[in-house]
């Protein structure tokens, strides 16, 4: 059954993807990412502390790729409400999203500038952050870990894809002489 989500009235959503029990939405500017659903591995990308098992967010919330952790809300009485404050999002700092890919419990985002971000389930290297680390609760920029035998190279992500507990990315390089 299709259901209209009133939250999106007046917002022009142009990109969507869905993970195991959560959804991602990007507006036509490419700078506003919204997420809702289950988020106990940090896959909703908007909490400061690891949510309880089964944490579920019914209404979509904005997830900035670039944020100031100092401008966040600390709620000691209810840590589940600790989140990035939307008023502190600097729109000019937000990169334009080219692609969003939802794995089972983690997210990958590709920007038009060739950068990539990931967050969510971090075990077994699922987020591609270079090691088997804890869950990544907020968007974190991916840094390619590649070496060249000669010269200095710059890398650009071309495509990202999240799977069950793994990620794949297509990266191009340009050697600078």
Regions found by a protein language model. Give the residues of each.
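Eukaryote-biased RCC1-like beta-propeller repeat architecture
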Residues: 1-177
